[in-house]
Amino acid sequence: MSNYNIETKCVQSGWQPKNGEPRVLPIIQSTTFKYESSDEMGALFDLEKSGYFYSRLQNPTNDYVAQKICDLEGGCAAMLLSSGQAANFYATFNICEAGDHMISSSAIYGGTFNLFGVTMKKLGIECTFIDPDASEEEIEAAIRPNTKLIFGETIANPALTILDIEKFANVAHRHGMPLIVDNTLSLIHISEPTRH
């Protein structure tokens, strides 16, 4: 879908029905899925096979919605989580571990500021908050040998400060680390954080 316009992606991406399947994405409400044997289920639990076995972990409806978001964002993969805070925690905690350091714009949602400044600190991950108007040199000065990522919000909540994504991305990429962008308050096709 990468060559399609945003309007087409909104309508067509994600669910791709085959002949005889519903035109509209069905909502799968089952929490569990049937298999012929416990060996088949065991292979799924052991991650030897791919498939659905428990909706809390994976569900066809969620997968299609995630694929649509991925197509709209121009990404390579996506997953659904229960909240923005869950997404921020998941993204940062899968990159950082105890003893690591991260950098974040200081103009971010209060819950995220608390997550990085208090909760992650209790887990041994230190965060340095940087003014979003800082120069590339000032951002680079905050980088340490154990810095694993840089974080920012496209439009900060509630201050509505606009993040210079390109500036933060330049620093992150120069140092071989990801820039994680919370794009909650922006429209996908306007800010396009994955372009950076």
Q: What do these predicted ranges mean?
A:
Residues S37-A86, G111-T119:
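Conserved N-terminal alpha-helix of the aminotransferase class I/II PLP-enzyme fold
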